[in-house]
């Protein structure tokens, strides 16, 4: 079986409406919308694949989408980015996912209001299974647990590394731990480690997660506060690049795509983190999850300026 360096993603994809507001309103309050941009797609795995493709990686998505206008727009975004969607199935009568995102212009923070799809689980046909089995890495986000677990099982049986964006959590914590254990590359958000392990500190929780399964990478992203990385059995803090963030929507998703791109190219852990942090920082300079994703040349120029 020929193995490629392709990043195959199974996870959430949606269409975002980015609303920049004067200030985030209190409950039962109001605020003015300064601008609306509904041209960009979103979703953790989806945006990671777009970022990787923009950086030159070979990428493909396995997903279900509704046979609706929203699904058309989501697919158009992938086509523009160069992400293969040959294994995306359109579901007649299905509703594709969309999301309203409020952005605070003072600090670039975002609050999401997802409108979930009503789509059935993915049917992992022979074609889809083969795509995973030949991948350089499988990237998951766990939003749809059944889809993520099925894909992870296919990858593990074929010896394909599993990358998990550990941000979504199931109510049954045993399910979270099962998926986390299957991940070879585990990159969490700031909340996930303590939430699923019950450990008192983030560092202790990350070490516990790193000990589950056969981890090659265990990281926690902290936004402007950098990254925690397990290195030789100890937690190391790696600072972020300082930028004036316009919008942090998709910053973590982009980090994943950039990290996997660098990792599949054979770079060491610190180089992968530094590259991903640079790409993520540049993304934050423009509104939306994708408009600010840099090209490889732009990312390398930024790194050269901050060496």
Where are these regions (language model features)?
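Glycine-rich phosphate/adenosyl-contacting loop at the front of the ribokinase-like
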Residues: 1-64, 69-76, 80, 244-245
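Conserved phosphate-binding/catalytic region of the ribokinase-like
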Residues: 1-8, 33, 202-307
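A glycine-rich helix N-cap at a beta->alpha junction
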Residues: 79-93
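Active-site glycine-rich loop that binds ribose-phosphate moieties when present
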Residues: 119-127, 146-147, 165-174
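Conserved phosphate/ATP/ADP-binding segment of small-molecule kinases
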Residues: 154-163, 168-237
């Amino acid at each position: 079986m020929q193995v490629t360096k392709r990043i195959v993603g199974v996870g959430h994809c949606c269409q975002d409406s980015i609303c920049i507001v004067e200030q985030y309103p209190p409950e039962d309050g109001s605020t003015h919308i300064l601008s609306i941009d509904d041209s960009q797609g979103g979703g953790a795995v989806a945006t990671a694949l777009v970022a990787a493709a923009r950086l030159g990686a070979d990428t493909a998505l396995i997903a279900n989408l509704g046979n609706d206008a929203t699904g058309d727009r989501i697919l158009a975004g992938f086509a523009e980015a160069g992400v293969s969607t040959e294994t995306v199935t359109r579901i007649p009568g299905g509703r594709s996912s969309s999301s309203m995102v409020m952005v605070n212009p003072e600090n670039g923070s975002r609050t999401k209001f997802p409108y979930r799809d009503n789509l059935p689980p993915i049917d992992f046909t022979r074609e889809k299974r083969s795509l995973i089995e030949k991948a350089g890495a499988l990237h998951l986000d766990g939003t749809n647990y059944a889809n993520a677990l099925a894909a992870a099982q296919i990858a593990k049986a074929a010896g394909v590394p599993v990358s998990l964006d550990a941000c979504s959590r199931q109510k049954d914590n045993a399910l979270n731990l099962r998926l986390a254990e299957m991940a070879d590359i585990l990159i969490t958000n700031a909340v996930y480690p303590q939430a699923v392990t019950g450990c008192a500190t983030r560092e202790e929780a990350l070490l516990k997660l790193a000990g589950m399964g056969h981890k090659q990478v265990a990281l926690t992203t902290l936004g402007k506060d950098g990254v925690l990385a397990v290195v030789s059995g100890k937690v190391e803090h790696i600072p972020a690049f300082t930028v004036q963030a316009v919008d942090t929507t998709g910053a973590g998703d982009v980090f994943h795509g950039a990290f996997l791109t660098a990792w599949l190219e054979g770079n060491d852990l610190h180089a992968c983190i530094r590259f991903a942090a640079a790409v993520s920082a540049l993304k934050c300079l423009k509104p939306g999850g994708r408009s600010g994703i840099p090209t490889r040349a732009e990312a390398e120029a930024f790194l050269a300026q901050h060496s």
